[in-house]
């Protein structure tokens, strides 16, 4: 999952930091290390959790984690998220949502098949900070946005499907995970440079990128 977009934590069990050569197990050439996101899987017990957050700068967020056991060998889990938040910076906001249903089937002892799908949508205004003067942040109002918020949009739509199979063989476990993903991403922003000597003008550069 190498595409550059803002990932959310709503459906993660944990994050593993694999340092040095350990990162090579993924076949990506990440010799310096990688962060491995471990997604939540169905449990063979009931679980129902809902969380709501309200905060400063119009922050609103809700998450849900629902799990159910279906018979003796099947379980399903549904994770969902929605967030809409502002910022201390003028014109900066974000809205994102995600849903991740998963199903686990364990027909035999030592055999487990897990199928999952995730849809994530993220739209926001890119915030590249304030200008600088003489090698340090300029003495300006921190709420100032340099550029045009209407032309600094970041958008991502992500669809990820996965199938994971585990088979115990004696004391060893054989694992195979297949992932198919589709990404629709656009990034555009303005970058403020250093202020002029008279502190009256700021040079702006801009670029965009689509995946």
Locations of regions flagged by a protein language model:
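Acidic/polar loop-and-plug regions of large Gram-negative outer-membrane beta-barrel proteins
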Residues: 83-87, 100-106, 110-168, 173-210
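Periplasmic plug
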Residues: 1-21
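Short, solvent-exposed loop/turn positions at domain surfaces
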Residues: 3-6, 64, 88, 149
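Short, flexible active-site-adjacent loop segments at beta-strand->alpha-helix junctions, enriched
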Residues: 21, 41, 119-121
């Amino acid at each position: 999952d190498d595409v550059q977009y803002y990932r959310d934590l709503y459906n993660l069990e944990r994050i593993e930091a694999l340092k040095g050569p350990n990162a090579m197990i993924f076949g990506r050439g990440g010799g310096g290390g990688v962060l491995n996101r471990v997604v939540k899987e169905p449990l063979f017990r009931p679980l129902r959790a809902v969380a709501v957050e309200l905060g400063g700068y119009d922050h609103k967020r809700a998450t849900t984690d629902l799990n159910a056991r279906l018979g003796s060998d099947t379980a399903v889990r549904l994770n969902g998220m929605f967030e809409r938040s502002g910022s201390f910076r003028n014109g900066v906001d974000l809205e994102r949502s995600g849903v991740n249903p998963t199903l686990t089937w364990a027909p035999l002892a030592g055999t487990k098949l897990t199928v999952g799908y995730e849809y994530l949508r993220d739209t926001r205004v890119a915030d590249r900070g304030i200008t600088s003067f003489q090698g340090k942040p300029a003495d300006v109002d921190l709420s100032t946005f340099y550029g045009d918020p209407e032309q600094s949009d970041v958008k991502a739509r992500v669809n990820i499907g996965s199938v994971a199979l585990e088979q115990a063989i004696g004391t060893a476990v054989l694992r195979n995970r297949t992932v198919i993903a589709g990404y629709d991403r656009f990034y555009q922003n303005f970058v403020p440079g250093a202020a002029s000597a008279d502190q009256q003008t700021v040079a702006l550069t801009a670029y965009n990128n689509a995946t």
